[in-house]
Amino acid sequence: CFYEIVDDYLRLFHDKEGRIMYDQMSDMRNRYIDMDGRMTFGTVGGYAVQSRGDGGYYVKSRGDGGYPVQGRGDTGYSSQTRSDDACLGQGRGEVDTGMSYDASTGVCTDINRGDMSSDINSGLYSGGRMDDSCHTSESRRMDDPCGTDESRRLDVPCHSDDHYRSDNPCTDDSCQAEDRRGGHSDSHRIDISSEESASRRSRNHAFAEGRMSEMRLRYMETCRRVLPFMERTLEMQHGGDTFFCGDEMMLCDMMCYCALENPLMENASFFGQYPKLMALRERVASQINISQYIKRRYQSDF
């Protein structure tokens, strides 16, 4: 879909450079498609055989109604069971997977690895009825792909409800009685969750308050270092008599006013030692163009 969208876009806007890039991407895409097509080189006896690039090949699947097989034609096999009493691979005459099947004894043997299984006629694949046990034939097939090895079979005992009630302490009558009393009730869990939420909010609030106090202290310390320099600068302007001359409001006036607002609200006597700064603040506040705004303005937090 990406290539179709880009193609429509380039056709609509006539982007020459984009068209060149799109053609290059299309050529690369076609080359990858051709490479993928050459990877699969046909079927052998109903199997789709695909090359691996290292001299071997993969046997991917069958097309005759049997179960799919995934195998390696060079070093070994990896086979699933079939429902027609035959191990896939050797014995059907299609692809040599290193397996040998004896129909008289029901033994499926790996030539490279030796005898892997025995007795596949125990009812799993001969059409007989499965015994009513806790484990299924699917789990046996996963353990032994060519049959069932009696020595490897693990029968999982089926326990009744009384067995689990006696072993599990949370299923006996005492635990149920505790549930009725509210020991593990939903309301108890809700109370715990609400308490945890309240505790988390309290911690966050305390952290925010501590952070705010830290920022205020840092700001006040910055003012203690910067304001003396600002005071000396105002005294240098025309001998300190006409600093920031002019009737129009200047940007530096407004910046100075905003910089002095919060520390003055924190401590009214903070500017007692900076008379020029206090005079500047009063001058800014008395400007006609900005006085109404200053009166409406509320204290901004950090």
Curated annotation (Swiss-Prot):
Residues 68-92, 118-205 are annotated as: Disordered. GO terms for molecular function: structural constituent of eye lens. The keyword Repeat applies. It holds the Pfam family GST_C_3. This is S-crystallin SL4. Gene3D superfamilies: 1.20.1050.10. InterPro entries: Glutathione-S-Trfase_C-like, Glutathione-S-Trfase_C_sf, GST_C, S-crystallin. Residues 45-84 are annotated as: 4 X approximate tandem repeats of G-G-Y-[AYP]-V-[QK]-[SG]-R-G-D. Belongs to the GST superfamily.
